[in-house]
Amino acid sequence: RSRFPDILKIEAQEPYAFQDAIRGEYPQYAKKVEQLPPQQAGGKLTPQGTVNNYQFISADSQWKVSLTKSFIALSTHGYTRWEEFAKRLDRILAAFIQAYQPAYFSRVGLRYINAFRKAELGLENAQWRELIQPGYLGLMGDDDAQEGAFLKNEQNITAAMPGGAKCNIKCGPGMLRKINNQTRQSQEEKVFMLDIDLFMEGNTPMNHAVPALNVVHGNAGSLFRGAITDTLHDAMEPRDA
């Protein structure tokens, strides 16, 4: 997600020119009116208004571009390689810059939400401390800890990273709900969530956005690899880039 100073034109009218530029890859369109979170003023929560979130979705529904008056984002359910994601993002940012000429980006970032499933990896009988490094497990990482006794065990970390980047990490065991597209029945599965939000703040010129994202991405790989054990790494059958 990349943030920029509010562009009122985006809120005031449908993004026709931007859609024309990316419609070949993202033919589906939806507009959502979202309620902004309340802000605290004078010790009281003050209700805020709404914001238009324009969404452009690929034909297979695996990729989505979100555009509001203050940010643009690309998300996917099927992330496999950085190179593909980066190429798509580069085309989207080029179309956005041409349509709206933003002054600069105030925040550029990448967010990776990982859900590790033991059964899917053939690790049903493994304990999380065999798969996740101790620093990401908290008390559950102790050798004598009973994994099933923990009702909640969430770690929240904010740290400075090389190259001027920062990260927010949220991790811990949880339940992931899966919905069968045919029957619409839902099923919950135990997973370990690793939510990594990497970003750079400050005024980033348009022509420096891609280099800034490369710095952010460069930190993502080391963070991810540092969070998992060799056992989990090998079970995921990583491919060479």
Task: Go through the PLM ranges and name each one.
Residues R1-L67, G202, H208, P238-A241:
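N-terminal low-complexity, intrinsically disordered segments
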Residues E25, R88, I92-A99, V216-N219, ...:
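Conserved short hydrophobic interaction patches
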Residues V51-I57, R107-R184:
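Aromatic/basic-lined ligand-recognition segments
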Residues E189-A241:
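Long, compositionally biased interface segments
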Residues Y29-G43, Q98-I113, D144-K152, L223-A241:
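Short glycine-rich, low-complexity/disordered patches
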Residues D60-Y100:
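Hydrophobic alpha-helical segments and helix pairs
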Residues E14, F18, R81-R88, I92, ...:
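Short amphipathic alpha-helical segments
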Residues R1, W63-Y79, F105-I113, E188-E201:
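Glycine-rich, often proline-containing surface loops adjacent to acidic residues and nearby aromatics
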